[in-house]
From Swiss-Prot:
Stated family: Belongs to the complex I NDUFA1 subunit family.
PANTHER family per UniProt: NADH DEHYDROGENASE [UBIQUINONE] 1 ALPHA SUBCOMPLEX SUBUNIT 1, NADH-UBIQUINONE OXIDOREDUCTASE MWFE SUBUNIT
Assembly, per entry: Complex I is composed of 45 different subunits.
Protein name: NADH dehydrogenase [ubiquinone] 1 alpha subcomplex subunit 1
Keyword annotations of the record: Electron transport, Membrane, Mitochondrion, Mitochondrion inner membrane, Respiratory chain, Transmembrane, Transmembrane helix, Transport
Topology versus the membrane: Single-pass membrane protein
The protein's role, per its UniProt record: Accessory subunit of the mitochondrial membrane respiratory chain NADH dehydrogenase (Complex I), that is believed not to be involved in catalysis. Complex I functions in the transfer of electrons from NADH to the respiratory chain. The immediate electron acceptor for the enzyme is believed to be ubiquinone.
Pfam families membership: MWFE
Subcellular location(s) of the protein: Mitochondrion inner membrane
Transmembrane segments: 1-21
InterPro entries xrefs: NADH_Ub_cplx-1_asu_su-1
Amino acid sequence: MWFEVLPGIAVMGVCLFIPGMATARIHRFSNGGKEKRVAHYPYQWYLMERDRRVSGVNRSYVSKGLENID
């Protein structure tokens, strides 16, 4: 019957889901608790470069709040 396909679909769905979640967890672990930022457009790249300059440690994922900027 049609429901015999459901376990195979579930296994396939889990196998497609795991790499995306693992990638997000690895990026969060390696970037100090933040997810990796992606710059698809020049404006996003500009914001990442600004964050890198403002951080003081030359890393875009180390953020400083407005109260900590000299």
